[in-house]
Each structure stands twice: as structure tokens, then as C-alpha cells.
């Protein structure tokens, strides 16, 4: 019997909303330009899986970097992004606009979208947002596992800003002006709602779980899911066991599908997405 392939299904556009693979590549843990059975993905396996578009996240860990190094590490990531795309130009191309996305995917190549995960990369300066945009960044995740100058993280018990900060609201408005995608995965509950309130454009949660299924502060409540959907946004269900189920048993594809179904039931199928 012939193995099932992604290409056996009706034609559609498949976009993976989040991967840390570029960070792994930067750190020398994996070469995503070469096929491998290790790690989340590489270009060869993406092609085999029928992936049309991929958001590559660059993030600098505050536990590994010092304040003042965050922006430069993110800029280093933009260079790494350009380098891997150039090495595999026959299979993948960086895209910065919807028209470029359509052109690249129509040509049968993977559209690579660059993101920065964690507003701490701005180091409290809005001009760094413009710098990132000029370097091709089109997605910014407001927080990572740490609160920053833009707002509070779901992982931070202190919540210093009580949601989105004044600078965070300015950053949201600037991203709206630039046409960037705003990502609220990792954000504290109030940061999510404040971001939705401040943004004139749809907002995504690129890699989150469902709190109704797994009571975990990184996961979204039903109220947040409905609010993101009402704003025209999309939620990507994260493929990590401790986001998907309460028990410590190994998660299965059924757990992922049940989370996607939950979003479809309370917000509609247009708002359920696929992360890495």
C-alpha cells in the first residue's frame, strides 16, 4: 500500500506559525539546510510534508544573554535567516509581503517569514522595531517567558506592568502602521486583552494550548480564544505534551486534534491554526 502523503489531500495553503529551528541552527545544534531525522524540522522534511509557509522565530534567552545583548542577537538571527534561505534558494525564499508569499508558493517554494520572539529584543527602544522591520522581520511576539518593557509574560508571577505597558501600546500601534503580525503567545492574560484592545489589526497566538484542557498559565482561556477570533486572529495549537494534557502520559495526535476541535467549536474553524 502506498504511504499517505500530504500531497494526497486537496490543495490548500499550509502555514506553520512557529518554529525554533532557526535558533537551533544558530547555536550549531542542527543544520536545517540538510535533511535529518533529528529536531523539529529541516527544509527537506518541510517540503515532504507539504508546508507552504513557515514563520521562523529568533529569540534570545535572558538567562543566557545579558541586557544590552538582546537586540544584537536578534539581528544576528536575521543574518542567519538570510544565509540559510540563500543556501537553499531552490526550495525556500524569504518573503516580506503577501504578494511575495503568493509568488513564492505559486512557484512551488516554501515561503519563509522571519519573526522575533520576545519584545525584550527591542531593549525598550521603538526605533529597534523599525530596524528589525528593515531587516525583514514581519512578526513580533510581545513577550517570551519573561516580562519586558512592552508587557507582562504569563510566566512572570510579578506582572510589573499589569498587562501591556505604555511603550507596549506604542509598539502595537507602530506594528500596525508597518503591517507586522503581532503574536500574543507567552503573554499574560491581561497583556493578551490589552494587546487586542490596542491593535487595529488581527492578532495571532502562534503556539499556545487550551486552558480548558490543560490548566496552565501559558495556555489560552476560552474568553481569550473568543476575543482573538472576534478580532480576526488565529490560534496555533502547540505540539508539546505538557501543553496538551493534564497527565504526564505522552501526548498523541488525538490530543492536538481535540484542542483544534475545541477552538473550532467555540470560535469557528477560521481561527484554528497549526504551529510547530
Language-model features: locations:
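N-terminal hydrophobic targeting/anchoring segments and the immediately downstream early-domain regions
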Residues: 1-159, 215-275
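Histidine-centered catalytic micro-motifs
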Residues: 14-22, 187, 205-209
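Short N-terminal signal/transit or membrane-insertion segments
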Residues: 69-77, 163-171, 200-217
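Alpha-helix-loop-beta-strand connector modules within alpha/beta enzyme cores
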Residues: 85-86, 160-178, 195-205, 266
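Metal-dependent enolase-superfamily TIM-barrel catalytic cores that perform enediolate-based chemistry
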Residues: 135-189
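Aromatic-anchored, glycine/proline-accented short structural segments
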Residues: 190-233
